[in-house]
Structure formats: C-alpha cells, structure tokens
A protein has these predicted regions:
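Membrane-interface helix-loop-helix modules in multi-pass membrane proteins
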Residues: 1-62, 185-216
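Short alpha-helical transmembrane interface motifs in multi-pass membrane proteins
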Residues: 5-9, 34, 72-73, 163-167
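Small-residue-rich segments of transmembrane alpha-helices in multi-pass membrane proteins
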Residues: 6-11, 67-79, 131-146, 199-208
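Transmembrane alpha-helical core residues of multi-pass small-molecule transporters
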Residues: 13, 42-46, 108-112, 130-134, ...
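Hydrophobic faces of transmembrane alpha-helices in multi-pass small-molecule transporters and flippases
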Residues: 161-170, 199, 203
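Hydrophobic alpha-helical segments and their helix-loop junctions in multi-pass secondary transporters
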Residues: 78-103, 111-123, 127-159, 167, ...
C-alpha cells in the first residue's frame, strides 16, 4: 500500500504540471462550479483510465519507440519544464528581485534536471513526493488562514461553460497518452494500484484548489 501511495503521489504531481492550481481557480471563478466539477472529475478519471488500460494491456508501450511519437513526447516534456520554471520564477518574485528570482529558478531547474539525468526515474519520483507533500500542506495552511473571511460563491455555469467543461474532459482523457512520464511510472507500478491512489490524491488537491478559489 505504501508503495502505491508513494508512486501515486508522484503520478498526481506529474499530472498537475504546475498550472492546475491557477487554472483551477480561474475555472471556478469564471466558469462556475458545474464546469469546474466536470473539469476536475475528468482530471481524476483520466489517471484511473490510463492505469486501467495500461495494466490490462490495451496500451502498448512500444508505440513510444516510433520516431514521430518520440519527438512529440520530448516536445511536451520541454513544454512542461518551461511552464514549471515559469511558475517557480513568478513565485520567487514575491521574495526576490527579478534577476535573483530568475537565477534561482534557472539554478533549481538545472540542478533537478542533472539529478534526474544521473539518477533517472527514482530521483524524479522522490522529488515529486516532496513537491506533493509541500503542495498539500501549503494549500491546507492557506485554506485554514481563510477561515472567518467572507467567501465569494462561484457563479452558476452557463451552457457554454458546461460545453467547455465537456470539451476539456475529452482533451484530458486523451492527452495523458502523449505524456511519457506516466508511461514510465505505469511500467514500475507493480501493485497496479498507484494510478488509483493518484486519482484520490488529485481529488484532494483539487478540492483545496476550489476552496481557495472562493477567496479572491
């Protein structure tokens, strides 16, 4: 069970990218609760579906060896890294001047890249675990500090907002197939339960995101 939780945390953090915190709040605040629930449910079910299809042999890892697929997945990984470094830089701007925050973010990005290049998947999973714990603790503390502050209820979703939620759900359910991180983690998921644990972790994470979205 501990192995599933350990790997599941890594899967959830890998799936979060770094943009889901801000994006989730924006969806709840602008598109309403119904659209947020569709988007959030799709995010969680995507992890369950991918794990189920992989372990039932419906997904063939050999497809990743195709040159076109390999180029595409590498581009996605670079894109994810850029997004995460951008989020880190914006966070550091709250504490340092622009040049210092840029240098710190670049240095941390280079260090983690070299660490994962040397240690491989094990290092990536280990760093994900600490990111996950810090994220949940941080969001929980922020939610606690909001107790007693008047909240702003989410607007009611319009038909177009719900349509957007359904469209995004379709994209999410298929988009995970192009992310090589999850293929790598599925390969070492000996218990075949890590993706289910990841969906629960991600649901808790998005619940905290929604709570914080009520406080602008």
């Amino acid at each position: 069970m501990l192995q599933s939780l350990y790997l599941g945390t890594s899967i959830a953090i890998s799936w979060a990218w770094g943009t889901s915190l801000i994006l989730g709040m924006q969806i709840a605040q602008t598109k309403g609760l119904e659209a947020f629930l569709i988007w959030a449910t799709a995010n969680c079910l995507t992890l369950v579906l991918f794990g189920f299809l992989y372990h039932r042999k419906f997904l063939n890892p050999l497809v990743l060896d195709q040159p076109v697929v390999r180029v595409f997945t590498n581009l996605i990984q670079i894109f994810c890294l850029i997004i995460q470094l951008k989020i880190l830089n914006e966070t550091l701007l709250n504490f340092f001047d622009p040049i210092s925050s840029y240098l710190i973010a670049s240095g941390m990005g280079l260090f983690l890249t070299l660490l994962m290049f040397q240690k491989g998947l094990k290092a990536s999973i280990f760093t994900d675990l600490w990111q996950g714990l810090l994220t949940i603790v941080g969001l929980s503390m922020m939610a606690y500090l909001c107790i007693g502050i008047p909240s702003n209820p989410s607007p009611t979703s319009s038909v177009s907002d719900i349509s957007w939620g359904i469209w995004s759900a379709v994209i999410l359910l298929s988009g995970i197939m192009t992310d090589i991180q999850h293929w790598q983690r599925a390969k070492v998921d000996d218990t075949q339960k890590a993706f289910y644990c990841a969906s629960v972790f991600f649901a808790i994470y998005l619940s905290l995101v929604y709570v914080l979205s009520l406080y602008k």
